[in-house]
Amino acid sequence: MAEAEAGGDEARCVRLSAERAKLLLAEVDTLLFDCDGVLWRGETAVPGAPETLRALRARGKRLGFITNNSSKTRTAYAEKLRRLGFGGPVGPEAGLEVFGTAYCSALYLRQRLAGVPDPKAYVLGSPALAAELEAVGVTSVGVGPDVLHGDGPSDWLAVPLEPDVRAVVVGFDPHFSYMKLTKAVRYLQQPDCLLVGTNMDNRLPLENGRFIAGTGCLVRAVEMAAQRQADIIGKPSRFIFDCVSQEYGINPERTVMVGDRLDTDILLGSTCSLKTILTLTGVSSLEDVKSNQESDCMFKKKMVPDFYVDSIADLLPALQG
């Protein structure tokens, strides 16, 4: 039994067999997928994943894609989905299925800065993040390299700031520097300047067990220096689900979240009362699930999926015939 494999909880973390998958899919209208580690690894689709999603589309299931990656626009993600064989809308509707932290951060600022004339944000992040902000009318400054100017703190603090910056947005930024951190702190000395983080992922996993520092490390650096707490947009924050819900009109009882990370994907699903499926093609393992099940911490128990699969391709038999 899968329950024994995952830790003995009689109601949670059941292996999703073809028979169980048929029953589950009959109760579900919408499936929300994480991307990296679930649908693909880098530029390679998980074997069988494109066929599974095409079969779900053919069955009339509504699909959404929720990613903490802020380095691509939703249009760029839609192009990748099509390029790797997952299908999806084209033309003016391309990207409408994708809810990334770049896009959702832009929605958040549009809400919070409503009524502010010509809103402006200092962005520690990617051109894609800046592009999504610009698309909703928020001017972005700060993207790209920024090295220290001068010989010491007096020189660094003398560097001119952009006027009227109303938000500091921290995403994945390979050009993160002490100069940028210093500027962010200076902007945040204004009490009406918002601090927004795209996500709190501590690591970005790579192939062969390697990893690099994630966006959460950068957000924490700004929080500590500014002595401010960021508003977090991405999983497991409810805000990113609210973005999906507002555009899709989702019924949580008929929605499933599919992901490879317990602390983001599965926790989001649990928080938002969704059914959850863990796929073992990415970050989290059954040993991680077992540890959470055996913990006395109720927060960790929220990071236990309803079901698990070795790969989302395991859903395919339930969709055939």
UniProtKB/Swiss-Prot annotation:
Substitution effect: R41N: Slightly increases phosphatase activity with p-nitrophenylphosphate
Cofactor mode of binding and number, as noted: Binds 1 Mg(2+) ion per subunit.
Marked site: Important for substrate specificity: L204
Active site: D34 (nucleophile), D36 (proton donor)
Official protein name in the record: Glycerol-3-phosphate phosphatase
Organism lineage: Eukaryota, Metazoa, Chordata, Craniata, Vertebrata
NCBIfam families: HAD-SF-IIA (TIGR01460), PGP_euk (TIGR01452)
Entry's Gene Ontology molecular function annotations: ADP phosphatase activity; glycerol-1-phosphatase activity; glycerol-3-phosphatase activity; magnesium ion binding; phosphoglycolate phosphatase activity; protein tyrosine phosphatase activity
Matches recorded under Gene3D superfamilies: HAD superfamily/HAD-like (3.40.50.1000)
GO biological process: glycerol biosynthetic process; glycerophospholipid metabolic process; negative regulation of gluconeogenesis
Organism (species): Mus musculus
Reaction catalysed by this enzyme: O-phospho-L-tyrosyl-[protein] + H2O = L-tyrosyl-[protein] + phosphate; sn-glycerol 1-phosphate + H2O = glycerol + phosphate; sn-glycerol 3-phosphate + H2O = glycerol + phosphate
Tissue: Ubiquitously expressed with higher expression in testis, heart, skeletal muscle and islet tissue (at protein level).
